[in-house]
Regions:
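A polyanion-binding, active-site-adjacent surface
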Residues: 1-223
Length: 223
């Protein structure tokens, strides 16, 4: 299987949603309002096993968005995205590599509730296509409200969803694509890097090469 935040394939290629489609949340104009709606969401089966809706966090006017797959155990418990081991690595990339504060960017996931294999929280899995489709209006509206100058997709699910492709992240990383006119830079999910050597993994160098392209696009200093 292609590398991603969890083993297995997610079927993202089956999903066909764009911001041009009718969004049930189109009249919502702030992230706080959208978060309130998301907190009561029952649009898919993930609501039955979640502890918390993990909406996203960061600067509502961020120039840069990071979009991952879905919450894990720690995120489900805290209500915050990317706060486990993968989140620690992402935070280091943002703060030590890009010389930004985590609160300067916006971090979200394709789905807002934790997908697990058995619904009991023993093992995470990629979201199913119908779960992504059900949750996608939240992400699409987040993008519309924030209006970022660039998006970094982390792993297969978010990359395949935004770019409407069946290609895997191994082929797509290192390239620049576009979603609704916004530059998109696919790269490996931090958890995949951690599972394959962490700080000593050559994948980390690949991620850093991808991030430098983002920085150049945004006009950020590289030293």
């Amino acid at each position: 299987p292609q590398p991603g935040p969890a083993a297995g394939e997610s079927g993202m290629s089956e999903v066909s949603v764009s911001s041009g489609a009718s969004n049930p949340f189109a009249d919502i104009v702030t992230l706080d309002e959208l978060k309130d709606v998301a907190s009561e969401c029952r649009r898919c089966r993930l609501c039955e096993t979640r502890k918390t809706v993990v909406f996203g966090e960061g600067n509502p006017k961020a120039r840069l968005m990071f979009i991952g797959e879905g919450p894990g155990k720690t995120e489900d418990e805290t209500g915050r995205p990317f706060v486990g081991r993968a989140g620690e690595l992402l935070t280091r990339i943002i703060e030590n590599g890009m010389h930004l504060r985590r609160e300067d960017v916006y971090i979200a996931n394709v789905v807002k509730c934790r997908p697990t294999v058995d619904g009991l929280g023993t093992r995470d899995r990629p979201p199913e296509a119908d779960e992504t489709a059900a949750c996608s209006p939240f992400l699409l509206r987040q993008i519309e409200i924030i209006k970022p100058d660039a998006i970094v997709t982390l792993g297969n699910p978010s990359t395949r969803f935004l770019l409407k492709t069946t290609e895997g992240i191994t082929k797509l990383r290192g390239t620049e694509a576009s979603f609704e006119g916004i530059p998109v830079f696919p790269t490996y999910h931090p958890s995949y890097v951690l599972r394959n050597g962490g700080d000593s993994s050559p994948l980390k160098k690949d991620v850093w090469a991808d991030i430098k392209k983002v920085m150049a696009k945004l006009g950020l200093p590289l030293n």
